């Protein structure tokens, strides 16, 4: 009985996908981005709101890119905050530094 329910939902999903694909192709051919009367056909279907959400996400991405362009100072500050909050990471970094120093000392002793 569950097989029938799954098959029905798969068929419905397939039909929805084919219909959506057809709409996308038609919109691409008709130039959806250029509404002639000022009201996009999608606005009636509620899809216009989705377009606005994408625009907002793009604006946020642009702001992030601007931060990256300004410099890496922000990234260094973020790392310091993380290390200071946990305390463990800073201790681990100190241990790694000690290992590096010891390795260097051993190399110099062997060279002499």
Swiss-Prot record:
<dbReference type="InterPro" id="IPR004931">
    <property type="entry name" value="Pro/parathymosin"/>
</dbReference>
<dbReference type="GO" id="GO:0042393">
    <property type="term" value="F:histone binding"/>
</dbReference>
<feature type="compositionally biased region" description="Acidic residues">
    <location>
        <begin position="41"/>
        <end position="83"/>
    </location>
</feature>
<dbReference type="GO" id="GO:0005634">
    <property type="term" value="C:nucleus"/>
</dbReference>
<feature type="compositionally biased region" description="Basic and acidic residues">
    <location>
        <begin position="9"/>
        <end position="35"/>
    </location>
</feature>
<feature type="compositionally biased region" description="Acidic residues">
    <location>
        <begin position="92"/>
        <end position="101"/>
    </location>
</feature>
<dbReference type="Pfam" id="PF03247">
    <property type="entry name" value="Prothymosin"/>
</dbReference>
<feature type="compositionally biased region" description="Basic and acidic residues">
    <location>
        <begin position="102"/>
        <end position="112"/>
    </location>
</feature>
<dbReference type="GO" id="GO:0043066">
    <property type="term" value="P:negative regulation of apoptotic process"/>
</dbReference>
<comment type="similarity">
    <text>Belongs to the pro/parathymosin family.</text>
</comment>
<keyword id="KW-0539">Nucleus</keyword>
<dbReference type="GO" id="GO:0045944">
    <property type="term" value="P:positive regulation of transcription by RNA polymerase II"/>
</dbReference>
<feature type="region of interest" description="Disordered">
    <location>
        <begin position="1"/>
        <end position="112"/>
    </location>
</feature>
<protein>
    <recommendedName>
        <fullName>Prothymosin alpha-B</fullName>
    </recommendedName>
</protein>
């Amino acid at each position: 009985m569950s097989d029938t329910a799954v098959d029905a939902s798969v068929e419905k999903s397939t039909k929805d996908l084919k219909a959506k694909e057809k709409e996308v192709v038609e919109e691409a051919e008709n130039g959806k981005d250029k509404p002639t009367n000022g009201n996009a056909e999608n606005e009636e279907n509620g899809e216009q709101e989705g377009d606005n959400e994408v625009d907002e996400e793009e604006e946020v991405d642009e702001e992030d890119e601007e931060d990256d362009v300004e410099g890496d100072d922000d990234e260094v500050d973020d790392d310091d905050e993380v290390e200071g909050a946990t305390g463990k990471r800073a201790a681990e970094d100190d241990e790694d530094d000690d290992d590096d120093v010891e390795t260097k000392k051993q190399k110099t002793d062997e060279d002499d």
